[in-house]
């Protein structure tokens, strides 16, 4: 699937960045909604 045989570093960083932003967004949204404090 990958021509180089491995995942490009920029793609790993991009996915990691999106994942981190999503997790932080869900965490702050949960805390704002009042369900984050119960977890």
From Swiss-Prot:
- Keyword annotations of the record: Membrane, Photosynthesis, Photosystem II, Reaction center, Thylakoid, Transmembrane, Transmembrane helix
Question: Superkingdom of the source?
Answer: Bacteria
Which InterPro entries does the UniProt record give? PSII_PsbJ, PSII_PsbJ_sf
| GO BP annotation list | photosynthesis
The answer on whether this UniProt entry bears the keyword Transmembrane helix reads yes
For this UniProt entry, which segments traverse the membrane?
Answer: 7-27
User: Which coarse location class describes where this protein primarily resides?
Assistant: membrane
- What's in the GO CC field? photosystem II reaction center; plasma membrane-derived thylakoid membrane
Q: How does it assemble?
A: PSII is composed of 1 copy each of membrane proteins PsbA, PsbB, PsbC, PsbD, PsbE, PsbF, PsbH, PsbI, PsbJ, PsbK, PsbL, PsbM, PsbT, PsbX, PsbY, PsbZ, Psb30/Ycf12, peripheral proteins PsbO, CyanoQ (PsbQ), PsbU, PsbV and a large number of cofactors. It forms dimeric complexes.
Q: Which HAMAP family match?
A: PSII_PsbJ (MF_01305)
Q: What is this protein called?
A: Photosystem II reaction center protein J
